[in-house]
């Protein structure tokens, strides 16, 4: 493929006109604060987790050896199978992510600081079709930066929970809360018609720092006031632990993201931001759409990887915008169908940063 930047941008704009499902990984949060990333979480777990005795202690020792040996957190946590140790990891993870989120909630939600997704969400929501004004966002992130950004933009959003001080999961009720009655002309008279507001439907497929589940797993609630501090007795944060064992946990909590499965299965395109392709249970549906069904997609992320390359080779219309590895200066590579072996190199450009991508493309 004879590709230049103008042609690439035209391709991207064509994909974005399809109103893509937005997939947001931790890279988007790290653009605001690196503490949202796995390396900083690994350090916090290393410092803070106090394992129990017996197999708990043995498994945690293997995790620490792996981390000290240079393994990433996801791989290191493969050693964890004990429920008690998983709960300790969730407790520390939730408290740590909540503490970082707390540093930003006011500044981002009031617009004092412009979050990295601010411009992107503005463009996507403003471009929603009136016949289906819904922007689906799928994220494995525990933090609430997407929610804060929507608040700053005054964009209505729902994560599937009802309204209230403590909210229950009810997607039907949540969607209905996005309806507004309008008076529309019908011949010589007017008729009241229910219309959806342009809004975001947020699918938090690994749970969230403001989700809580009771110990017998019969109730799932969202409570923003309980984000800071430990959960009440008999409750724990509803978060799927990092590590590849999350596939098993996801299977046990499939109802959390059944709506995400539906959004992915019906997507006309995907815009994938700061995502590491480490979640098989989510990616299965995305890959089916991109590879088996010829759906279009764009990956915008800092790090080029063999995983991204493999997906592009197997897909008919998947593109990646990444930092040029080893360039030693601001430089972007654009890779798409037909030029995997010879990427377009954009010197003095940082289009892999979502803010710069939005400026150049949207």
Predicted regions and their residues:
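Polyanion-binding interface signature
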Residues: 281
């Amino acid at each position: 493929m004879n590709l230049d930047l103008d042609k690439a941008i035209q391709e991207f704009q064509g994909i974005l006109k399809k109103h893509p499902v937005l997939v947001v990984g931790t890279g988007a949060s790290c653009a605001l604060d690196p503490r949202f990333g796995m390396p900083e979480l690994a350090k916090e777990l290393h410092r803070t987790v106090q394992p129990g005795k017996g197999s708990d202690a043995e498994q945690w020792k293997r995790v620490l050896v792996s981390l000290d040996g240079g393994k990433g957190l996801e791989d290191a946590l493969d050693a964890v199978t004990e429920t008690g140790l998983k709960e300790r990891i969730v407790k520390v993870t939730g408290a740590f992510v909540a503490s970082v989120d707390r540093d930003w909630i006011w500044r981002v939600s009031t617009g004092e600081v412009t979050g990295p997704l601010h411009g992107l969400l503005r463009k996507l929501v403003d471009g929603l079709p009136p016949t289906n004004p819904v922007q689906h966002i799928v994220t494995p992130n525990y933090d609430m930066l997407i929610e804060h950004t929507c608040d700053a933009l005054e964009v209505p959003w729902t994560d599937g929970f009802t309204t209230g001080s403590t909210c229950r999961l009810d997607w039907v009720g949540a969607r209905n809360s996005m309806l507004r009655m309008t008076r529309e002309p019908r011949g010589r008279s007017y008729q009241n018609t229910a219309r959806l507001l342009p809004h975001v439907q947020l699918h938090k497929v690994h749970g969230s720092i403001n989700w809580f589940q009771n110990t017998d797993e019969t109730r799932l609630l969202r409570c923003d006031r309980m984000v800071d501090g430990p959960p009440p007795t008999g409750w724990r944060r509803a978060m799927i632990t990092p590590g590849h064992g999350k596939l098993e946990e996801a299977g046990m909590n499939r109802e959390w993201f059944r709506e995400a499965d539906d959004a992915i299965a019906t997507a006309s395109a995907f815009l994938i931001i700061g995502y590491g392709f480490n979640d098989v249970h989510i990616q299965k549906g995305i890959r089916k759409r991109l590879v088996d069904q010829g759906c279009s997609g764009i990956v915008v992320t800092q790090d080029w990887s063999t995983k991204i390359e493999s997906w592009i080779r197997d897909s008919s219309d998947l593109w990646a915008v990444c930092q040029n590895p080893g360039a030693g200066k601001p430089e972007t590579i654009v890779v798409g169908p037909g030029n995997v072996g010879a990427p377009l190199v954009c010197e003095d450009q940082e289009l892999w940063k979502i803010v710069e991508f939005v400026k150049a493309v949207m």
